[in-house]
From Swiss-Prot:
Region (Disordered): 1-87
Organism name: Chaetomium globosum (strain ATCC 6205 / CBS 148.51 / DSM 1962 / NBRC 6347 / NRRL 1970) (Soil fungus)
Record lineage: Eukaryota, Fungi, Dikarya, Ascomycota, Pezizomycotina
The protein's name: Methionine aminopeptidase 2-1
Residues that bind a divalent metal cation 2: D222, H291, E324, E420
Chief site of localization: cytoplasm
PANTHER family, sorted: METHIONINE AMINOPEPTIDASE 2, METHIONINE AMINOPEPTIDASE 2-2
Gene Ontology terms for molecular function: initiator methionyl aminopeptidase activity; metal ion binding; metalloaminopeptidase activity
Positions contributing to substrate binding: H190, H299
Length: 439
């Protein structure tokens, strides 16, 4: 196939017109008179000159574009393409135009861990957590109400942050990472004393789990511990604490989640506890998990179960994780309890929500301005003097704008425990922010 352009029929006719028979120009003098030989020679010479000029012009136009290849092809290509501009090949667009892998993009998005401000804020939040829970160890005794413990924890956190969080937007700068969880016995997670509930007082035989978070600029230290007043439950607490520490120790860059889960389960199930003459194997809760943490989002998307699984997802440099384990003498499987623990704004919800109820619109605005996607509870709304919010809240929950969280429990008569630490996977080591002398 030739690289040049074929001549069109119009071009052929135009070129052949130079070779015509003279037409009317020759016959204009023709009435039988004699033709002058000198004049005829001159005219013939002029026609030949015109013919030669046309050919030269044609050669010049061909020189500017690729010429015709012979058959078989013998003309060197440099003569056919004197300009060196050869035909471009077929262009097929890439389906993916990204020049980096998904893992590289995730890593680039986590460069905050190298930032001094990020580390300083996380360490500050962890120190506030340690000092606050020291007060809990001293104060949480039989006869004390759960409501007083919860309010005392939250007042302490806000005081140490020097931020009461009462002005619009102040609680987004720093404050509670989520509502304080205070769970007794078979209550495994997500119970908090809310206004209007019957007071609950600690008893000598209770096993109390304390779970609270501290955030600065949306980065949350999530840490929990369990305490008991009767040494009967010491082995239950030891099993869960050991399992959590094993999970933290096993975790690392490029470690698969399935490996962390298997290590946790193996350690926890190696413990037994004797309660009132009956021996129980400590069981990991099968349908709860640890998690990574994103800014303003306590659950970042990766989950770390406490039982063996096939999850080949890897932990990555720069990620923040909350390794928590729950152990139980019951079924090792949680179900919903009655009541409401707290609420959280759905991070996928649109900014402008089409709700007809005016109270729902006002409440949505209050939530966005004061909590964002931080989980909150009724106590936090009432601190802001928000009134008559239940109808509006129900509307937002039904619309999927706000998510509602309830208490979680194992079978009645069982006992459960939880320990949890927040840590950062740095390039050369793990930094366990929430580690303290107590656990």
């Amino acid at each position: 196939m030739s690289g040049g352009e074929s001549r069109s029929p119009d071009m052929s006719r135009a070129g052949d017109g130079c070779l015509g028979d003279g037409g009317d120009d020759e016959e204009s003098d023709g009435d039988g008179g004699e033709v002058n030989p000198a004049s005829a020679d001159a005219e013939s010479t002029q026609k030949k000159r015109k013919k030669r000029n046309k050919k030269k012009s044609k050669k010049k136009s061909k020189a500017d574009s690729p010429g015709e290849q012979s058959s078989p092809p013998r003309i060197p290509l440099d003569k056919l393409f004197p300009s060196g501009n050869f035909p471009e090949g077929e262009v097929l667009e890439y389906q993916a135009t990204a020049r980096t892998t998904a893992a590289e993009r995730r890593s680039n998005a986590r460069q905050h861990w190298e930032d001094d401000t990020f580390l300083r804020n996380y360490r500050k939040a962890a120190e506030i957590h340690r000092q606050t829970r020291r007060w809990v160890h001293e104060t949480a005794k039989p006869g004390v109400s759960l409501y007083d413990i919860a309010v005392g924890i939250e007042d302490s956190v806000r005081a140490l942050l020097d931020n009461a969080g009462l002005e619009t937007g102040e609680a987004l700068k720093s404050g509670m990472g989520f509502p304080t969880g205070l769970c007794l016995n078979n209550q495994v997670a997500h119970y908090t004393p809310n206004p209007g509930q019957k007071p609950v007082l600690l008893q000598e035989q209770d096993v109390l789990t304390v779970d609270f978070g501290v955030h600065i600029n949306g980065w949350i230290v999530d840490s929990a511990f369990t305490t008991a007043f009767d040494p009967t439950y010491d082995n239950l607490l030891a099993a869960v604490k050991d399992a959590t520490n094993t999970g933290v120790k096993t975790a690392g860059i490029d470690v698969r989640i399935s490996d962390v889960s298997a290590a946790i389960q193996e350690v926890m199930e190696s413990y037994e506890v004797e309660i009132r003459g009956k021996t129980y194997r400590v069981k990991p809760i099968r349908n709860l998990s640890g998690h990574n943490i994103h800014q303003y989002r306590i659950h970042g998307g990766k989950s770390i179960p406490f039982v063996k699984n096939r999850d080949q997802t890897k932990m990555e440099e720069g990620e923040v994780f909350a390794i928590e384990t729950f152990g139980s003498t019951g079924r090792g499987y949680i179900v919903d309890d009655v009541g409401v623990y707290g609420y959280g704004l759905n991070h996928n919800a649109p900014l402008n929500v089409p709700v007809a109820l005016p109270s729902a619109k006002r409440l949505h605005k209050t939530i966005r301005e004061n909590f964002g996607t931080i989980v909150f509870c009724r106590r936090y709304l009432e601190r802001l003097n928000v009134e008559k919010y239940l109808a509006g809240m129900n509307c937002l929950v039904q619309q999927g704008v706000v998510e509602e969280y309830g208490p979680l429990m194992d079978v009645k008569g069982s006992y459960s425990a939880q320990f949890e630490h927040t840590f950062l996977l740095r390039g050369t080591h793990k930094e366990v922010f929430s580690r303290g002398d107590d656990y």
